[in-house]
Amino acid sequence: MSVHLTEGRRIIQYTGFDDIDEEDVEPNEEAEGPGGVHKKRRGARKKNRRQRMEGLENVDQTVDLQLVTVPKVVPFRASRLLQEIYDRERVHGMRRDEARQLLEDKLLFLEEKSLENLHLRRFCLVVPSDEHFQLDDGSKIPSEIVSISMENGKISSILRVFPSKTRSFEMESVENFQSHRMRRVYWNPSIPKDSNSMFRTWNHFLDGCLLSLLLVPLNKLTQVLEFLRKINEMRTVINNRITVSICLSRVICVEDYLSAVQKVMNTRTVQLDHIPSMDLPSLHFALDFSRYHIQSMNTIFTGSTEMDKLSDENSSHELVEFSSWSCHREAHINMEPEKYHRILHWLWDLSPVNPVDEAE
């Protein structure tokens, strides 16, 4: 509110603000009144306030962008060599000796109760057929993939996947085969939707396995790895991006798995049953191999229990103790730093405590 006196008359003008500062008064040459009094421009204070608020918003946006662009410091990803090793093993698989050593390290990080009930955990065995199915591009994949899940020391369910050129994706109803739940799945590899549906169904069946491992017979290892690579390539083309459907580093042969378990459990060399014959059809061979794996695990843990009893009766024998983190650290004191940190990264979630803190 402002008051001006002009030729004996009082003129009241409303400016909108009662607390206008001197900095808000701007000269106006054209609107200069009597006595050289400059009129005050309306809205100047609001304009200055708006400019200050916009400046703060720009600063906040700049800070937000900086927070988004600054990557989180992860020791594993900071090394280009380790990242290349991880990508290679994920896409091309691991060597047998590395897979066996890594499995031993993972088992060492499990708690004592988990090791005692290791043979009762969930396992999945994957067996491809020797017959082939030709794709549109001329490449070949197995005509059947048999997956068997084992839990609580027995076979729980069976999933059979068949590629077909005449039938689209279809899941048949559950049937009973030798007192086991079995389901057949058909899919057309030339249809993108079928490939994604088949993979989701198969991946859901393989979910929940111990350490996310896929057990494969040694004589079928190459076929399974080639099939997984082909599935990865097909889904990469379908999704128009690099897609790793199932990491090949999850695959390990049953013989190496049993050998690693024997070493971790500190049992004597156990004479396992004979491996099933290869002359059987894929389904029967997979069932026999699953029973072979269950019996072998029971034999290993039975031998471990007997050794514990002998140790209690005879004090001269050393007690069988589960390896702790200190034993794991001493066993890998001469390991290459890259491989050692890679193992720590993979076993981060398995350790009951933070392994990096103890290592320091």
From Swiss-Prot:
Comp. bias regions, Basic residues: 37-50
Protein known as: Uncharacterized protein ZK1128.3
Organism, as annotated: Caenorhabditis elegans
Region (Disordered): 22-55
Compositional bias (Acidic residues): 22-32
Superkingdom, taxonomy of origin: Eukaryota
